[in-house]
């Protein structure tokens, strides 16, 4: 049965006690148990004794990065190119750090306002996961790079949008589907081009956690959204679309290019917006978001043309994250030298 809008609103806008402690033996419970099995300690399970050589790049791709074709980059000395690489990585990872702090805050809110016992337990376990992610990203930036960048205004806007909305399910959509889905794709891509084995190990462990978070969000939201009225579903679909628009802007980081390539902020932004490989990178990240929005019923007729205009509907039929490989997820943590590519 569908809830009335007013009744639903009352449920969304209050902190939610749940005095029914019946443990539902379902996928949410299994994900919670899996999280307990796979807890790792950021202080001792990562090889902090390793430091990447100062004269080597942290990231390296098979093809040239777009900025490497510019005359301003070619004019840099070898030492300046290495320093640019460090700043580029620091700017990107600083946004990861800020995003993980946002995820920490939202997960703690979900433990308070999620309506069911199982969801509260899972949100509490995710809160600890996010705290661990903040810890390890911050330590890597502080100890291994020594450079820190402030939060991207678009990311701050997205986090504020999610944190200040009083409806628990919009927090789920914004965090578990949009932000965590984008993070999962971004972390996977960065891991694939990292030449620093410590960074590769760090990202691999974080990715294992994030995969559980996204699967939790999809499994919990799919059934709930079916109980909403068409108007409420469209409202959430519009929220998801707006979050995706902000997220595309979040993916544009300009500070390191301004510093080393002599670009203005607008020039650096336009360069990234108008460079095909950057566009492909941004769109690729949504390959982990769009199929999940489709799975939970938020690619409505009203928002489909808007996603089409962004060039993102091509991912609609890509694999979603509803199902997970339980055997793969239960594997013991890989050792430092054995992290898969």
Residue locations for each model-derived region?
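Alpha-helical transition-metal enzyme core signature, strongest for iron centers
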Residues: 96-104, 126-141, 176-187, 206-217, ...
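Inter-helical turn/loop segments and adjacent helix faces that build the functional surface
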Residues: 110-121, 144-147, 188-205, 219-235, ...
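Conserved alpha-helical segments that form or flank metal/cofactor-binding pockets of metalloenzymes
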Residues: 28, 34-65, 127-150, 217-222
């Amino acid at each position: 049965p569908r809830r009335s809008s007013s009744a639903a609103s009352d449920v969304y806008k209050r902190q939610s006690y749940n005095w029914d402690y019946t443990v539902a033996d379902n996928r949410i419970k299994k994900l919670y148990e899996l999280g307990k099995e796979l807890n790792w300690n950021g202080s001792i399970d990562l090889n902090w004794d390793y430091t990447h050589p100062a004269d080597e790049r942290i990231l390296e791709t098979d093809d040239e990065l777009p900025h490497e074709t510019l005359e301003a980059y070619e004019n840099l000395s070898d030492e300046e190119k290495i320093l640019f690489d460090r700043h580029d990585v620091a700017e990107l990872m600083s946004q990861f750090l800020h995003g993980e702090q946002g995820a920490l805050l939202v997960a703690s809110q979900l433990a308070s306002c999620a309506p069911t016992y199982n969801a509260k337990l899972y949100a509490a376990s995710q809160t600890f996961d996010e705290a661990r992610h903040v810890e390890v990203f911050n330590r890597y930036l502080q100890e291994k790079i020594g450079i820190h960048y402030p939060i991207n205004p678009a990311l701050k806007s997205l986090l504020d949008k999610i944190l200040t909305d009083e409806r628990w399910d919009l927090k789920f959509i914004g965090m578990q589907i949009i932000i965590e889905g984008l993070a999962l794709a971004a972390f996977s891509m960065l891991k694939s081009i990292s030449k620093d084995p410590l960074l590769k190990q760090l990202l691999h462990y974080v990715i294992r956690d994030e995969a559980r978070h996204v699967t939790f969000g999809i499994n919990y939201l799919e059934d709930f959204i079916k109980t909403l009225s068409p108007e409420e579903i469209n409202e959430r679909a519009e929220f998801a679309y707006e979050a995706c628009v902000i997220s595309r802007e979040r993916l544009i980081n300009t500070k390191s290019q301004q510093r080393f390539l002599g670009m203005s902020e607008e020039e650096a932004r336009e360069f990234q917006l108008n460079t095909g490989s950057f566009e492909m990178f941004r769109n690729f990240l949504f390959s982990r978001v769009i199929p999940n929005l489709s799975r939970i019923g938020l690619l409505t007729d009203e928002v489909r043309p808007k996603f089409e205009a962004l060039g993102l509907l091509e991912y609609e039929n890509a694999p979603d994250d509803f199902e997970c490989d339980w055997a793969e997820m239960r594997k013991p943590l890989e050792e430092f030298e054995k992290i898969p590519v």
